[in-house]
UniProtKB/Swiss-Prot annotation:
The lineage of its organism: Bacteria, Bacillati, Actinomycetota, Actinomycetes, Bifidobacteriales. Belongs to the MurCDEF family. GO terms for cellular component: cytoplasm. It comes from Bifidobacterium longum (strain DJO10A). Transmembrane segments: none annotated. This is UDP-N-acetylmuramoylalanine--D-glutamate ligase.
Length: 481
C-alpha cells in the first residue's frame, strides 16, 4: 500500500488511531486526526473535513456504519478502512524469512482473548516472536496492531479481531483463523445478527493453512462450510464431545485429534494429552470449566495448523494461566461447615459469556452478581437456562430493568436484591455485602455480570478489581479465623 503523499483521516484518536497516525506520518502520509474529545486532534468535528482532498478514512470501532461521516466518505468513493485493514496492507517482511510474518486471527462473541493469549504462549514457547495484538492490545502503543505489523522482528502475530474491526476490513488472507462462537451481541452496531455473523466470517475468507471453528455452534459451522479458503487449507472443528473425523475434542478424559492437524490422517484418532494435565481449565475440585477447555482446543488447533512443534506447544499449554477477570478465584472465606468462594469473571460482558460461567458450577450454588450496561440485550433465556444454578441474584448497574424483568418472568422464586445505582464508589462493597446474606458453606459468589461495565466503572478490569477488594474485605470481616 502506497501511503506517501496521501491524505488519511483518522476518525478517533484512541490507542489504535494514534498509533496508526504515527506509523502513517513516518511514511510520508498527511494525517488529519478527528476527535471531538481530544485537545490534540487536528479537527474536532467531521463538519470541518475537506473531503475533496481525502484519500482514505480510518474509522474507529466507536463509529457504526451508519455514522454520517462514514456515509459521506462512501458517497464520495473514499475507502473507509479499519486499523486492521491498514495494518494488513502496511505489513513488512520479517527480517529472518524475508516475507511478511504470518497472522493468526481469532474472533467470536466470547473466548477471543483467552484463545489469543494461549496461542501466543504456545508459539513463544516454540521459540517464535509471537506477540498478541489487535483488539486485545493494552494501552502500550508499541504493541498496537499497526506497530506490530510494521516491526520486522515479529515472527507471527496473534491477532484478536472484533466484529467492529472486521466490518471495515476486506483484504485479509490469514494463515490460520478461528471463530470461537457466535451469539447475539452488538446487534445495534451491525444492524442485525446476519450482518454481525457476516463480519465475523471475514476471518475465514482466503485463509491459507487452517480455519478452526466451533463444531457445536450451528452458525459457526455453517460459516466454516461456506468459507472460501485457499487450496489445501484445513478445516478443523473443535468440540467438547468425542470428535468426529475432521475435529479435535475430548474423549475418555483425553484431548483427541481426528482432524489431521496433529499429524495423523483425517479420521485417525491421535491422543494428545490427558485433560487432567491442564489445571487452569478446572475448578479446585477438578471439574472442568467448559469454555476454557474450548479456548484451549481452539488455540491448540491454531498453533498445530501453523506447524508448531506439538510437544512443546502442549507443555506450554499445561502451564498457561488465564489473564485476570476470567473465572478467577479472588477470595475464599471459611464459614461454618466449609467455605465460600468469590469468583471474578468480569470479562463476561454479555449473556453468552455469563451462561458459560454459570454453567461451570453446581446446582443452586451461585449467588450471582449481574447487571450493568445492557446494550439493548434481554436476559430471559439466560435466566431460564441457568435458574437451576442460581441460588440468589444481586443486581448492580444503572440499566437494571432488563435483568429485573428476566427474573420476574423466568425465575420468580429466586431471591433478588437490587443495589441502588447512585453511588458508584461503593456499589461493589454493597453488592458483596448483599451476597453475604445468602451464602452458606459450598456456595460461590460469582461476578459474571452479562453486561458492559462503563456505566459505573472505568472498565471490566476496574469492575473486577473492585469486586476482588470487596470480596477480600468481606472474607476478613465475616470469615472464621
Amino acid at each position: 500500500m502506497q501511503v506517501a503523499d496521501k491524505t488519511v483521516v483518522i476518525a478517533g484518536l484512541g490507542v489504535s488511531g494514534t498509533s496508526l497516525a504515527e506509523v502513517l506520518r513516518e511514511r510520508g502520509t498527511h494525517v488529519i486526526g478527528v476527535d471531538e474529545r481530544k485537545p490534540e486532534a487536528d479537527l474536532h468535528s467531521f463538519d470541518d473535513v475537506d473531503w475533496d482532498h481525502v484519500d482514505y478514512v480510518m474509522s474507529s470501532p466507536v463509529f457504526n456504519p451508519r455514522t454520517p461521516f462514514v456515509l459521506e466518505a462512501q458517497r464520495r468513493g473514499i475507502p473507509v478502512m479499519s486499523e486492521v485493514e491498514f495494518a494488513w496492507q502496511l505489513r513488512v517482511n520479517n527480517e529472518r524469512t524475508g516475507t511478511p510474518a504470518p497472522w493468526i486471527g481469532i474472533t467470536g462473541t466470547n473466548g477471543k482473548t483467552s484463545t489469543t493469549e494461549m496461542t501466543s504462549e504456545m508459539l513463544t514457547a516454540c521459540g517464535l516472536d509471537a506477540p498478541t495484538a489487535g483488539n486485545i492490545a493494552s494501552g502500550d502503543m508499541s504493541m498496537s496492531l499497526s506497530r506490530c505489523a510494521t516491526n520486522p522482528q515479529h515472527d507471527v502475530l496473534c491477532v484478536e479481531l472484533s466484529s467492529f474491526q472486521l466490518h471495515f476490513t476486506d483484504s485479509l488472507a490469514l494463515d490460520c483463523a478461528a471463530i470461537t462462537n457466535i451469539a447475539d451481541d452488538h446487534l445495534d452496531w451491525h444492524g442485525g445478527r446476519e450482518n454481525y455473523a457476516a463480519d465475523k466470517s471475514k476471518v475465514f475468507h482466503n485463509a491459507k493453512r487452517a480455519i478452526v471453528y466451533n463444531a457445536q455452534d450451528a452458525k459457526v459451522s455453517e460459516l466454516a462450510a461456506e468459507a472460501q479458503t485457499a487450496e489445501g487449507c484445513r478445516k478443523v472443528g473443535f468440540t467438547l464431545e468425542a470428535p468426529q473425523a475432521g475435529q479435535i475434542g475430548i474423549e475418555d478424559g483425553w484431548i483427541v485429534d481426528r482432524s489431521g492437524v496433529a499429524g495423523g490422517a483425517v479420521g485417525e484418532s491421535v491422543r494428545l494429552a490427558a485433560i487432567t494435565d491442564f489445571t487452569h481449565l478446572a475448578e479446585p475440585d477438578g471439574s472442568l470449566y467448559p469454555h476454557l477447555v474450548a479456548d484451549a482446543l481452539t488455540a491448540l488447533a491454531l498453533v498445530l495448523g501453523l506447524g508448531a512443534d506439538r510437544d512443546t506447544a502442549l507443555k506450554a499449554l499445561t502451564s498457561f494461566k488465564p489473564g485476570g477477570h476470567r473465572i478467577e478465584t479472588v477470595a475464599e472465606a471459611a464459614v461454618e461447615g466449609g467455605s465460600v468462594r468469590f469468583v471474578d469473571d468480569s470479562k463476561a460482558t454479555n449473556g453468552h459469556a455469563a451462561r458459560a460461567s454459570l454453567s461451570s458450577f453446581p446446582a443452586k450454588s451461585v449467588i450471582w452478581i449481574a447487571g450493568g450496561l445492557a446494550k439493548g440485550s434481554r436476559f430471559e433465556d439466560l435466566v431460564k437456562d441457568q435458574a437451576h444454578t442460581i441460588k440468589a441474584a444481586v443486581i448492580i448497574g444503572k440499566d437494571q430493568q432488563p435483568m429485573i424483568e428476566a427474573f420476574a418472568s423466568q425465575a420468580p422464586d429466586i431471591p433478588v436484591t437490587i443495589i441502588d445505582p447512585e453511588d458508584n464508589d461503593t456499589v461493589m462493597d454493597r453488592a458483596v455485602e448483599a451476597c453475604g446474606t445468602y451464602t452458606a458453606a459450598g456456595d460461590i459468589v460469582l461476578m459474571a455480570p452479562a453486561c458492559a461495565s462503563m456505566d459505573q466503572f472505568k472498565s471490566y478490569a476496574d469492575r473486577g478489581n473492585r469486586f476482588a477488594a470487596a470480596a477480600k474485605t468481606w472474607s476478613e470481616v465475616h470469615g472464621l479465623h
